[in-house]
């Protein structure tokens, strides 16, 4: 008896790591100034030289996964997008405090190492790192026979960024009257998929079905990778825009995430129907008979990221980022009331309340 007969192929695992190292060496990740990786993939630990030019540098850490979106990818046989998702979920979180992503680590767990699928995942991770401007510094691939069913894997990611201590965005800069500008999502991103899968299954749909008016099957629409907002935010930072706060709209939607970038005594007042809800969300609401407030608490509804900026900066931001659109403003919070106001005025997602 040996380890391979128990389900763990050490030789295949080592070959997989060598392949990752070769891919990393071939791909030129955008330079992060004077910082660089020291050594390479495959050691006991990854080494990264911090960039110079900071007076009081603060490291920022974020970790996340992709959730049950992985189940759709595994059924459909398309895995690269979830690699991008993994980086996006972590890098976008790190970005919210004003940090610049520096490096990323991944954790892949599977019952049996299947290189064809996992290479797609790794290629997606590398593509995400390129877009976020960070380095893939290392990771872990765990083969766990008997723990995961055949063809199944799980992912976790870890992103480290850096920010000047005096530039940290922690809610203290936000002022009453600040504008809320949204950056559009690319779709569902990586949240709400347990409900998506339940709706699809209960209504008798298959992932290869195309609802009326759709130009792609359900699986392709719902596997659209999460958008990475690093370059958009860095464009504003380079222009000297005074960003007062940022929110990454993930699990819990706008109601749970937008208040996280505000001061405790502040609330966000949304302008009802200030943006068109993408068709996939309308379809989910109709198919699942989901109440509007529950839709807001589960999905991003087309808003992937929110910028909190002073009123005088709004025109410049919209000039630099034409895709940005206004959704509301910062107001004083009332004790005991919601910190996101205006949701009750939406009624349905397609028409104002009566």
Swiss-Prot record:
The keyword ATP-binding applies. Its main location: cytoplasm. SUPFAM superfamilies: PurM C-terminal domain-like (SSF56042), PurM N-terminal domain-like (SSF55326). Its EC number is 6.3.3.1. NCBIfam families: purM. HAMAP family: AIRS. This is Phosphoribosylformylglycinamidine cyclo-ligase. The gene is purM.
């Amino acid at each position: 008896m040996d380890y391979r007969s128990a389900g763990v192929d050490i030789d295949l695992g080592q070959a997989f790591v060598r392949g990752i190292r070769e891919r990393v060496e071939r791909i030129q990740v955008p330079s992060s100034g004077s910082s660089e990786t020291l050594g390479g993939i495959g050691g006991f630990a990854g080494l990264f030289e911090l960039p110079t030019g900071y007076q009081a540098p603060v490291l920022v850490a974020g970790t996340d996964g992709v959730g049950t979106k992985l189940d759709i990818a595994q059924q459909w046989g398309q895995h690269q997008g979830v690699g991008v998702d993994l980086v996006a979920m972590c890098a976008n979180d790190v970005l919210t405090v004003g940090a610049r992503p520096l490096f990323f680590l991944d954790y892949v767990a599977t019952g049996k190492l299947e290189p064809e699928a996992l290479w797609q995942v790794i290629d997606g991770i590398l593509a995400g790192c390129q877009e976020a401007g960070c380095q893939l510094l290392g990771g872990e691939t765990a083969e766990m026979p008997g723990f995961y069913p055949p063809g199944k894997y799980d992912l976790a990611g870890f992103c480290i960024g850096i920010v000047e201590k005096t530039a940290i965005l922690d809610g203290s800069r936000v002022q009453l009257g600040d504008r809320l500008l949204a950056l559009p999502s690319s779709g569902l991103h990586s949240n709400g998929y347990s409900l998506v899968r339940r709706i699809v299954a209960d209504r008798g749909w298959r992932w290869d079905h195309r609802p009326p008016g759709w130009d792609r099957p359900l699986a392709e629409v719902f596997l659209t990778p999460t958008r990475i907002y690093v370059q958009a935010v860095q464009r504003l930072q380079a222009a000297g825009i005074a960003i007062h706060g940022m929110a990454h709209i993930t699990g819990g939607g706008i109601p749970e995430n937008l208040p996280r970038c505000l001061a405790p005594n502040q609330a966000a007042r949304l302008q009802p129907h200030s943006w068109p809800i993408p068709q996939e969300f309308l379809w989910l609401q109709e198919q699942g008979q989901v109440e509007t407030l529950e839709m807001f608490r589960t999905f991003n509804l087309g808003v992937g990221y929110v910028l909190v900026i002073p009123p005088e900066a709004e025109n410049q931001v919209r000039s630099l980022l034409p895709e940005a659109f206004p959704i509301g403003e910062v107001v004083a919070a009332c004790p005991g009331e919601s910190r996101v106001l205006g949701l009750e005025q939406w009624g349905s997602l397609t028409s104002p309340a009566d």
